[in-house]
């Protein structure tokens, strides 16, 4: 185990929609890497229970995606509350990274942070105010060197842990092809 202020916290959420004011978190996962993007540990992967009245608010895309992945069933059967998910995730993070030092890392991570701020503020406060957003590099690559995008593809399972692993792999790909580090 390697507790360090250089470690990075990666997080991904699956939600019932895109609006944190009306939608809910239904899955959370986290991974800690070192500064070289080597995975040190995977945190708890938690389906967060939401009542049926929240699940019926999902649009067709969310309903189809989260049903086919098995997530909707996991959410229905889960006894993990949002607060339970916060406590378990923080308990994991405290073993690897001091509070307030790691940027929040992921793909389109600003969206996840909006949901954390609204529904899991104690967890949101664990991160530094900075972002390490892989989608920023993707957008710049799309504009400046689009042929590089052909060399990386994602499975797109829309399960939180898979999405984090893909984000880390994508950042490694950009490091090797664009930054040549």
UniProtKB/Swiss-Prot annotation:
It is found in: Cytoplasm. The keyword Ribosomal protein does not apply. SUPFAM superfamilies: Ribonuclease H-like. Signal peptide: none annotated. Keywords: Cytoplasm, Exonuclease, Hydrolase, Nuclease. CDD domains: Orn (cd06135). Residues 8-171 form the Exonuclease domain. Its EC number is 3.1.15.-. One of its GO terms (cellular component) is cytoplasm. InterPro entries: Exonuclease_RNaseT/DNA_pol3, Oligoribonuclease, RNaseH-like_sf, RNaseH_sf. Its main location: cytoplasm. The active site is at 129. GO terms for molecular function: 3'-5'-RNA exonuclease activity; nucleic acid binding. The keyword Hydrolase applies. Coiled coil: none annotated. Belongs to the oligoribonuclease family. 3'-to-5' exoribonuclease specific for small oligoribonucleotides. This is Oligoribonuclease. It comes from Vibrio campbellii (strain ATCC BAA-1116).
């Amino acid at each position: 185990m390697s507790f360090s202020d250089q470690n990075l916290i990666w997080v991904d959420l699956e939600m019932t929609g895109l609006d944190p004011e009306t939608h809910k978190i239904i899955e959370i996962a986290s991974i800690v890497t070192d500064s070289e993007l080597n995975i040190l540990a995977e945190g708890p992967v938690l389906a967060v229970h939401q009542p049926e009245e929240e699940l019926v608010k999902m649009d067709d895309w969310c309903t189809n995606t989260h049903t086919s992945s098995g997530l909707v069933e996991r959410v229905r059967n889960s006894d993990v509350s949002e607060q339970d998910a916060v406590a378990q995730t923080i308990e994991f993070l405290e073993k690897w990274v001091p509070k307030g030092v790691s940027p929040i890392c992921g793909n389109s991570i600003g969206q996840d942070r909006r949901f954390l701020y609204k529904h899991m503020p104690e967890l949101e406060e664990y991160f530094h105010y900075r972002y390490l957003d892989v989608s920023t590099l993707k957008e710049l690559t799309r504009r400046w060197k689009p042929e590089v995008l052909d060399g990386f593809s994602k499975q797109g399972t829309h399960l939180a842990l898979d999405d984090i692993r893909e984000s880390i792999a994508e950042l490694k790909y950009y490091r090797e092809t664009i930054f040549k580090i």
